[in-house]
Amino acid sequence: LNATIGIARTLADEDVGKSLAEIQNTLFDVGADLCVPESSESESSSLRVVPEQVSALESTIDTFTERLEPLKSFVLPGGSPAAAALHQARTVCRRSEIEVLRLAETQAVNQQVLVYLNRLSDLLFVLARAANDDGHDDMLWVPGQGAA
């Protein structure tokens, strides 16, 4: 996930890139949190994902959403290279969330990790839309257009 976001970051503008850099740093906290089961009493407890990190994502979602036109249809992945890379990062994030859910079936997992990954995928969608707001249009789904 972090590497995929890194690729998107190389293609993104400065605003989006700054947000992605912060996310990449926090993803190391996510990894550290997952390495030490919730039930462990460890010095690593300072590396747990906390609600404030989720709140920071939500604040960034709000900031970028305010700049965008409201959606009138589902968005197809694509548009600018940065947007396409962000859509790809979003799908990797969703897969990561599913894997953490599977892990939670067998061991204690900090629920904030799951909340963080869920909100991160939403933010990556918003950032993909923002990346297309620089002169590229979002590619909108047209029902039935793909029918032969």
Give names to the regions the model predicted.
Residues 2-148:
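Phosphate/pyrophosphate-binding loop motifs in nucleotide- or prenyl diphosphate-using proteins
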